[in-house]
């Protein structure tokens, strides 16, 4: 199990290094997924502040979702974070997949955030 975690940490560091080089002052849309939930934040790394956040544990989503661990839940979270980021005045972000493969829940969240008005 520790080999899997080591590989994830290496991928995560590689992705973050590439993001830092390409960011040009844009906030980072950071994704964390667990086996049961999905979380996303829009982070301003220059000031060290979280500008917007959403997760499958939010009260308004929790009543509508059957589970927080499927693509439908990820899409709802993506729409919600896009809505909150636009309310905070953010439209251009850089996508931080945190070492996860761009597939399944991560891809569904990214597509929904794009549809919601975020540009990345």
UniProtKB/Swiss-Prot annotation:
Gene3D superfamilies: 3.30.420.100. GO terms for molecular function: 5S rRNA binding; structural constituent of ribosome. One of its GO terms (biological process) is translation. Keywords: Ribonucleoprotein, Ribosomal protein, RNA-binding, rRNA-binding. It holds the Pfam family Ribosomal_L18p. One of its GO terms (cellular component) is cytosolic large ribosomal subunit. This is one of the proteins that bind and probably mediate the attachment of the 5S RNA into the large ribosomal subunit, where it forms part of the central protuberance. Part of the 50S ribosomal subunit; part of the 5S rRNA/L5/L18/L25 subcomplex. Contacts the 5S and 23S rRNAs. Belongs to the universal ribosomal protein uL18 family. HAMAP family: Ribosomal_uL18_B (MF_01337_B). This is Large ribosomal subunit protein uL18.
């Amino acid at each position: 199990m520790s080999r899997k975690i080591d590989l994830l940490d290496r991928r995560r560091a590689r992705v973050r290094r590439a993001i830092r080089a390409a960011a040009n002052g844009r906030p980072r849309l950071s994704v964390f997924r667990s086996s049961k939930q999905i979380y996303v934040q829009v982070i301003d790394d220059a000031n060290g502040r979280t500008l917007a956040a959403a997760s499958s544990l939010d009260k308004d989503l929790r009543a509508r979702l059957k589970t927080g661990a499927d693509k439908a839940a990820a899409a709802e979270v993506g729409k919600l974070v896009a809505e909150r980021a636009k309310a905070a005045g953010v439209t251009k972000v850089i996508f931080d997949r945190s070492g996860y493969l761009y597939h399944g829940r991560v891809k569904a969240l990214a597509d929904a955030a794009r549809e919601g008005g975020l540009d990345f």
